[in-house]
């Protein structure tokens, strides 16, 4: 199926969901779209992403690439942790950061901790001899007073006996929205980094922190910022101006667009993603633009 035929086939369904925009909450619309995304992934997108990633790695053998922003059923995603891990590994990604929401009244911290526990379990039970285990990290996407902030911790905090430390540290974030400055500092004891997702994108609630606020309050405090996002349709160079690490991601909720935009680092210079971010030595990379037109339609209804 070519790109034009694919878009024509699903356009009617997408418009139908758009017609229900006011009547349905986002979780219901996500469930309606899930069957379509399953078809898209299997018949149209997976091969394209996988081939492009393989070419990218062939040209840059030391490059490690991964998804740094996506969601599972433990927040507002539609797929399980093991499904996301398996697809990411099949696509050829080296690392994966699932970023469940922590939002007062909506997304409790305990669900995010369960998601982290699932990542650990999947790693321990990985049995496919033909598929290398993908590197995963513990992480949250915290709702703050100024907007969302992704916090990524050292991999040691995937281990179940360390989850109580995360629970103690981050429990204030599910009781009320803290300032972004406070949230950024909370990750430091865990050897982690902070990432500003979808900057400067306004919603009716704190979502994308304004660039003006970042310049005045967050430079030197937050480690990284999304420069390219498939899910939100922007391609910028915020990181250079702000002195932060450059991040590329999808903000995938359907296990569909993972791998279309990635973050890369040189494995000769850094042992892992956290090391590269702290050194401000990462790059945002657009891998596949096949669904850019579709994502434009999706942003109107989700």
Locate each region found by the language model.
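Short beta-strand/loop segments at the ligand-binding rim of alpha/beta enzyme cores
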Residues: 193-194
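Distinct, well-ordered alpha-helical segments
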Residues: 147-151, 202-217
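N-terminal export signals
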Residues: 5-26
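Short low-complexity, flexible loop/linker segments enriched in glycine and/or proline
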Residues: 110-114, 209-213, 261-265
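Short, well-ordered beta-to-alpha junction loops that form the rim of enzyme active sites
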Residues: 197-200
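C-terminal segment of N-terminal export signals and the immediately downstream linker at the start
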Residues: 1, 22-54
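A metal-dependent hydrolase metal-coordination microenvironment
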Residues: 42-190, 220, 226-242, 246-249, ...
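Binuclear metal-dependent phosphoesterase catalytic core
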Residues: 252-302
